[in-house]
Amino acid sequence: MRLLEHLWVLAADLVRAAIARRPHQVFVPAPLASTRRDLHAGLVQPDRTTCGSACLVVARMLGDRDYARWLETGEVAGRTRDPRPRRRRFADEVLATHVRTNRWYGASGARQVAWPRALGTAPWALAHELTVTGGTSAPGTRHHVLVISPRRRGEAYDDVVGAVGRGHAVPLYVGNRTLPRHVVLVVGGDDAALTAYDPASGGPVTITRDAFDRGALRVAGWSEPWFAVVPVGRTAD
């Protein structure tokens, strides 16, 4: 085992132990979640740094039919039709989301840790954005970053399945043995496999439980699961 991976395992286990000492938190149902067949193909991230932002936009589309209709058709009640092509409208929304998640203040106006856009979207910024905008949850539903220890991937898989089983879409950070490098959005799953939206292709990918456990995902060229962003059973103040 590489030294960096050994240190990562140790750090992840310490974080998980700290989380385990907190009061038990239960996933809440997703009252706004639509059916997963509403996930339309062809929603591709506009550049190589916006996979997380694309997942945020698609999660909100799944939870907000008016927002999804506007992105798909440019039409929304009470407003002039947006003339941009669907691909351009989606790309612009993703890029605007990326700016919002990476600046010094978030969607709520509260200060946050800025993050270089060239490095993508930090997990904590993605969690904050979902807490404020809701995604497939009601706005104000707290989200937190689940650290996926290489020694406890099975537990993390069960947590993700539990969340999607309640109607939530779950962002999943994947990468190599050294770093997280990409984000996909898990939109369905069971004990055997997960179904995820991959913004690199704009289409669905299947992640088997065995591949998740072994760190052999083969998702957009990446193998290791690193973080999942999941809702918890309370609302933000």
What is each model feature region?
Residues 4-5, 14-17, 22-25, 84-231, ...:
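Conserved active-site-adjacent core of cysteine acyl-enzyme catalytic domains
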